[in-house]
């Protein structure tokens, strides 16, 4: 009988010791919980992200799903507006022979880098300035094609998938609203405002060529088809639309430009100038206003029959007593190397 109680007591002591050892093991082996960036409240994370250059956003979106969600949220846009951390971004759309859909690139400039004029030094790019493709995981930042009509801004989707959607917002507002849909779905359409109306062209399928171009009237909120410009323009790649002498000039990658007269409702053709013809081969691609400075994009035959796309930013100055504008090259470098058969489609400048 005594041996039974001794055994029972021995087992009890063993169990108690095992319990104590287990408790001590859990206590000492448990790692101290570290405070991570993502453990902070979203408001603080958004405030931090809003102070970072958007140049880092595409790479940050690859870190984790939480970052990706925050980076494409409207709350981040609101935070940037409140902090006034606006940035101007230059985008280009290129078409490559081995890809079915056009690719969107944005000009990336490494923050804190001293940029130089590599034209003078005849050097290759240091990588401080590049045209970086917008990754599919970050496709929500693919910019709208923006057209201002009066106090409103209209946006056309620049995604590869055709869409008839159009968006509108007041210039003082942050968020987009749905506008009346276009009559056909378009992929990367081009638009321009003239006489209080919005003209949209291109980006539709061959069987929808009747509505290749259409005009939107904000007053009546209705769309109206434009006359057929002819197969040469319909099957070409449109670069941009300009207004000159009350007519719309449609620039393409062909040897001629098309001109539309809204008053007569007729299309005509116009020969390209020698400068414009340089766009068809090796030469100037685009000129844009980049934050009050002149941005020039051009290509040049590089190694292995590829082409190097160069970019230069020029600061302009009008000197006293001289009726001339002087320019100083702030920096120039190769920003992208592409196949020689690539096609430049268009450029966009966003301030976000």
UniProtKB/Swiss-Prot annotation:
InterPro entries: F-box-like_dom_sf, F-box/kelch-repeat_ARATH, F-box_dom, Kelch-typ_b-propeller. Keywords: Kelch repeat, Repeat. The keyword DNA damage does not apply. The keyword Repeat applies. Kelch repeats lie at residues 145-196, 197-243, 245-287. It comes from the Eukaryota. Residues 34-81 form the F-box domain. Transmembrane segments: none annotated. PANTHER family: F-BOX DOMAIN-CONTAINING PROTEIN, F-BOX/KELCH-REPEAT PROTEIN SKIP4. This is Putative F-box/kelch-repeat protein At5g28180. It comes from Arabidopsis thaliana (Mouse-ear cress).
